[in-house]
Amino acid sequence: PIGPPSVSYIERALKDAARRQSPLLILQLDTPGGLDASMREIIQLLMTSPVPVVTFVAPSGARAASAGTYILYASHVASMAPGTNLGAATPVKLGGVAAPGTPGSDADNLSSPGGSDMQRKIINDAEAYLRSLAQLRGRNVEWAVQAVRNAESLSAEEALQKNVIDIVAAHVPDLLAQLDGKEIKLIHQTQVLRTSGLTIKKIEPDWHTQLLSFITNPNVAYILMLIGIYGLIFEFATPGTLIP
């Protein structure tokens, strides 16, 4: 899932790519979604990067759901492998909220007097954000709205047909072949990618990122919380047994 470890990892990868003067950075993505704050941090990093970022949803069977859809839209080049999907970009609270179009949800009718003001604000904000990314990158604005409002999803082939992504590639060498000669817009300039004969260097997560990923894993966090709660109960029940 997208979270603080993802931000740390991508920031380090972008700095490394800039230091090496790499012609591009391929961000391989497979995510069910994640935290809104972390997603926005990542998008800011991508949009201000001096190195072109090509997000590649891969391998086959991977997905760029929810927050992953926003990251894909924000990338200089959006690409997917066959058999992958994206979408379902409706924001939900950590506790869970009914998605638009489901029974009991008033997200479809934002003027409903019984609707949640906070829910309307969250959905409107998310829609405007994804719409702005679509306009910036010249991608399908109408579908971006539907992905937020109605949690719509697309396969890789459908996304290519609807101008949601730029490329469908079977693997990284195929992706590089299709990228060669492609013109992209960076912050202050336009750049033509020259990807023929490039050597691929994989950037692995460092120990700091791996530790953060372990600690912030929901299952691990829940276990640590239980250990803390039971530790407090035991200490209150038998004070001084473990700690004088």
Roles of regions detected by a PLM:
Residues 215-244:
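Core alpha-helical transmembrane segments of integral membrane proteins
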Residues 1-213:
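Soluble extramembrane regions of membrane proteins in the secretory/endomembrane system
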